[in-house]
């Protein structure tokens, strides 16, 4: 079983904000594959389905971003999911808007959701799908990440989200991670 985790903050005030990029991508993936995130427990909403013959668990923590690990680790334990079968979808300010980047391990890079997952899971060796939101030009970081995409930014983000969903499809299908990085980064 593969586990795809989207990072974001809960509550309608955070819907469609840059920091909820992970939620938006996993929602698109789940919708494309008819996976309903109807189970609510272990500080998360999740659902599962078959994608290309592989069972996939799609997870959205219901904690705030900086406590995401509190949801991820218990779900991994409950479903006996190996860290090698986990992909976390996150926003990344260090990537230009519209770029995606896959990594098979690494530090949190200042992302508090990733930092929490590393702390709870006990390793940095899990997959990341980073979706670029760019650096703020005129806003503080907090105001920027909690703000919504502008009218000009939204189509660029939508294209990146489509590529991210395609990358998730290829990952679930068992594509070699190095090949995925070469194809999508």
Swiss-Prot record:
Positions of the record's site feature: Stabilizes the basic form of H active site to accept a proton: 91
Pfam families in UniProt: Pept_tRNA_hydro
Catalytic activity: an N-acyl-L-alpha-aminoacyl-tRNA + H2O = an N-acyl-L-amino acid + a tRNA + H(+)
A GO BP annotation: rescue of stalled ribosome
Source domain of life: Bacteria
GO molecular function, one term: peptidyl-tRNA hydrolase activity
EC code: 3.1.1.29
Catalytic machinery residues: 19
GO cellular component annotations of the record: cytoplasm
Assigned keywords, A-Z: Cytoplasm, Hydrolase, RNA-binding, tRNA-binding
Cellular localization per UniProt: Cytoplasm
PROSITE patterns linked: PEPT_TRNA_HYDROL_1 (PS01195), PEPT_TRNA_HYDROL_2 (PS01196)
Site (Discriminates between blocked and unblocked aminoacyl-tRNA): residue numbering on this chain: 9
Binding site for tRNA: 14, 64, 66, 112
NCBIfam families: pth
Subunit description: Monomer.
HAMAP family xref list: Pept_tRNA_hydro_bact
Purpose of the protein: Hydrolyzes ribosome-free peptidyl-tRNAs (with 1 or more amino acids incorporated), which drop off the ribosome during protein synthesis, or as a result of ribosome stalling. Catalyzes the release of premature peptidyl moieties from peptidyl-tRNA molecules trapped in stalled 50S ribosomal subunits, and thus maintains levels of free tRNAs and 50S ribosomes.
Similarity comment text for this entry: Belongs to the PTH family.
Protein name per its UniProtKB record: Peptidyl-tRNA hydrolase
Annotated organism of origin: Levilactobacillus brevis (strain ATCC 367 / BCRC 12310 / CIP 105137 / JCM 1170 / LMG 11437 / NCIMB 947 / NCTC 947) (Lactobacillus brevis)
Gene giving rise to this polypeptide: pth
